[in-house]
UniProtKB/Swiss-Prot annotation:
Family of this protein: Belongs to the universal ribosomal protein uL10 family.
Keywords from the UniProt entry: Ribonucleoprotein, Ribosomal protein, RNA-binding, rRNA-binding
PANTHER family (alphabetical): 39S RIBOSOMAL PROTEIN L10, MITOCHONDRIAL
Function: Forms part of the ribosomal stalk, playing a central role in the interaction of the ribosome with GTP-bound translation factors.
SUPFAM superfamilies documented for this protein: Ribosomal protein L10-like (SSF160369)
GO molecular function, one term: large ribosomal subunit rRNA binding
Protein's recorded name: Large ribosomal subunit protein uL10
Taxon lineage: Bacteria, Pseudomonadati, Pseudomonadota, Betaproteobacteria, Burkholderiales
């Protein structure tokens, strides 16, 4: 299906706006993947806030020109799916997790913070916990000293109340 000029401009504008909002771009080759698997990948991506698009590579190159994702323009060859996400690790997680179970999806690379990523870079990015998990871990670290202090104070109070209960019993035995 051939696109006319206005349709191409609309696609470029849409992808340019996605690229402007996104922190991460992941590129994967989808040669031989079934429609059912692609539908599952798209629904997983949508639920995690990742925008997946199958684009003509020429349009994708034009859309990312001048953006932080321009560094991967040379990787845009062959049948590719492009994953954009505002969350720094979401696109990498979705594509890497799906690629583990489906060997037809091959990660080709990506970009993060204006730097090109190779396959290993995308996989390392996918292994980083999400922002919510990192914030929960930080809260746990900050709460740890407070909760330890509360436990120690509770133990001291319990020990002191046991000690005061033993003193009258000791006086009764002595009498």
């Amino acid at each position: 299906m051939s696109l006319n000029r206005s349709e191409k401009e609309a696609v470029i504008n849409e992808v340019t706006s996605l690229a402007a909002k996104a922190q991460t771009l992941v590129i994967a080759e989808y040669r031989g993947i079934t429609v059912a698997d692609m539908t599952k990948l798209r629904s997983d991506a949508r639920s995690k806030g990742v925008s997946l698009s199958v684009l003509k590579n020429t349009l994708a190159r034009r859309a990312v020109a001048g953006s932080q994702f321009d560094v991967v323009a040379d990787q845009m060859t062959g049948p590719l799916i492009y994953g954009f996400s505002e969350d720094a690790v979401a696109a990498a997680k979705v594509v890497a997790d799906f690629a583990k179970t489906n060997d037809k999806l091959v990660i080709r690379g990506g970009a993060f913070a204006g730097k090109a990523l190779d396959v290993n870079g995308v996989k390392q990015l996918a292994n980083i916990p999400s922002k919510e998990v990192l914030l929960a871990q930080l809260c746990g670290l900050l709460m740890s000293p407070i909760s330890r202090t509360a436990v120690v104070l509770g133990a001291l109070a319990a020990k002191k109340s046991e000690g005061s209960a033993e003193e009258p019993a000791a006086e009764a035995v002595a009498a």
